[in-house]
A protein has these predicted regions:
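An N-terminal assembly and electron-transfer interface module characteristic of large anaerobic redox
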Residues: 1-403
Length: 403
């Protein structure tokens, strides 16, 4: 009988929770003793019981993956726990997070607390500018435009380059593969991510797990596309495949959505919005882009041959038009909105509290939600901020005040 193997994921919110839960159920069924668990900062930052659960999970974990912990309210409650367990864990993988978190990464010979050397030093020299550097460049699209697509191309290329370099490069390769699996966050990719980390890093009495799990290459999904629940395959790269696109008489609304929610199958709030707009007699163009720069989606699906083909744009992302929690480029957003010259509204799902908490509170949005979801989009030029969805509260209880 194998020793138990515990993988814990700590991340910003719950948008990959359904995909992770499906992956965890399959792994547990096929490999008794293998546990995959996810904890969201949007829950434990405001709930002492949830914080106690994530601390206990980190304490008993063998491999921990941390992702998207940018905000101090999210990473400070667990930072000491991660530091305390760092050297005891089989591996600690920290991606897309605050520098204090990322530098805790330790995967085999790859230790991000040490000065960069060898392959990592070379990659840092090759990486170019980070998103947010030289913001607001004049003359059309800023330097950050299209960064999501270009970074994904590099991310897909790096593991192929590193495959043939021995030593620490193999651990660096798995770090970048972890990013690929995460950004393609379907249940299949989450299952392969867990399998890859177990196969490589299970240590001590858990070494019997090494090499036992089948691992597929990261499944690649479109970086840019459209979505509709009634469309075959749900995701496509051509707007002509959307229902109602052959009708030109109806007003047309462009919706901006997060790709990560779509890949994870966490789409009920989007589906509800699409249905509500269509019930009003509107043709809906729901679009997404890689990363948090919506301009490629706007240019591909809300414009044609330089001509604007939508009558209004509604962002459902909860973020700025160009940027996310770590940065935003209001000038670039202003430029593309000037080109569109149609009404631009920002609606947001509740990310850091449940609908029940929001509806039953005199406060309404939390300060971090007000900043990210209302104030920053207004700098872009968004109007009429509103809540359009979120996580339910206790099962079976209707939300009080959600109207």
């Amino acid at each position: 009988m194998r020793d138990e193997m515990r993988l814990v994921i700590v991340t910003m919110d719950t948008h990959l929770s359904s995909a992770t839960a499906m992956a965890a159920a399959r792994l547990a069924r096929q490999y008794p003793g293998l546990h995959l668990d996810m904890h969201a900062a949007s829950e434990y930052s405001a709930d002492p019981a949830a914080l106690a659960r994530v601390k206990a999970a980190i304490s008993s974990a063998h491999v921990v993956l941390v992702s998207m912990l940018f905000l101090e309210d999210h990473f400070l409650p667990v930072l000491d726990d991660l530091k305390r367990r760092r050297d005891d864990l089989d591996a600690l993988i920290c991606i897309m997070s605050a520098p204090d978190v990322v530098k805790l990464t330790r995967m085999g010979r790859f230790d991000m607390s040490k000065p960069a050397s060898g392959p990592m030093a070379l990659l840092k020299r090759l990486r170019g500018k980070r998103p947010g550097e030289n913001q607001g460049a004049k003359g059309g699209r800023s330097e950050t435009s299209g960064s999501g697509a270009s970074q994904m191309k590099m991310l897909r290329r790096l593991p192929k380059i590193l495959r043939f370099i021995p030593g620490t490069a193999q651990d660096i390769r798995l770090y970048f593969l972890s990013l690929q699996y995460w950004l393609g966050g379907s249940d299949a990719n989450m299952e392969s991510l867990a399998g890859m980390l177990v196969n490589r890093y299970a240590a001590g009495p858990r070494q019997v797990w090494q090499g036992r799990l089948p691992v597929a290459e990261p499944i690649e999904y479109p970086d840019l596309g459209v979505y509709h629940p009634k469309m075959a395959g749900r995701i496509a790269d051509q707007a002509d495949r959307l229902p109602g696109m052959r009708t030109t008489a109806k007003p047309r609304v462009g919706l901006l959505m997060l790709r990560s929610y779509l890949l994870a199958g966490n789409t009920a709030h989007y589906d509800g919005m699409i249905a509500a707009l269509e019930a009003k007699g509107l043709t809906v163009v729901p679009a997404f882009a890689m990363g948090l720069d919506a301009r490629p989606a706007i240019e591909a699906f809300f414009m044609r041959d330089g001509r604007v083909v939508v009558d209004a744009v509604v962002s459902l992302t909860g973020f700025s038009l160009v940027g996310g929690p770590a940065y935003n480029d209001a000038q670039a957003a202003e430029d593309i909105l000037t080109t569109l010259n149609v009404p631009y509204l920002a609606a947001h799902p509740l990310e850091f509290q449940s609908l029940a908490d929001w509806g039953g509170s005199n406060r309404g949005l939390m300060p971090v939600e007000t900043t990210i979801m209302v104030a920053i989009p207004e700098l872009d030029g968004a109007t009429s901020p509103m809540v359009f969805g979120g996580r339910p509260g206790v099962r079976g209880q209707a939300c009080q005040g959600c109207h």
